[in-house]
């Protein structure tokens, strides 16, 4: 059984974070809004979607960044390097979220990604088989396995859903009215797997997504969200 609640992975601040914290205190910079870095694997789909959470009344800075790494373990391992010299002060509310899919990751790769995230204090938004399963949950309570991303998109494009959907298209406005429904469905699926003592970060957890936790967190930082 998962022992991390709803995947709020915790751990020590990375060496890079400690160095930046010392530099920040020495320079006496004034307080700024916390920054949330979303390290996303390759595709613009996730980048385009999460950019829409950046609103004027949001009290965090949301910065989606594409990663050059396709494997989950490398994406998480190199997350600190991916943000480069950008400010990262976890003690002031900054967070790093690693957003990735099952894709060709083995269970060993997924386990390593989880282990590294815990060690570094990062968070994970994992989707199995792909990010589009999160979109699909806005329209259908999908609890049976979906073979791959193509099959997921085929379900997503059924009549009454996102019939014109293509990778990297803008879908936020169409999904927003159904977002709370998707969150509820995603969380129930995670809970069901946990009750069965099944590991979430495996190929066998299909279908599942922990994107709902990230969406809830981003919404909680918007003053206009109800």
Give each language-model segment a name:
Residues 68-71:
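Short, charge-patterned binding micro-sites
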Residues 76-85:
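Glycine-rich, highly charged phosphate/nucleotide-binding loops
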Residues 41-43:
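Helix N-cap/beta->alpha junction signal
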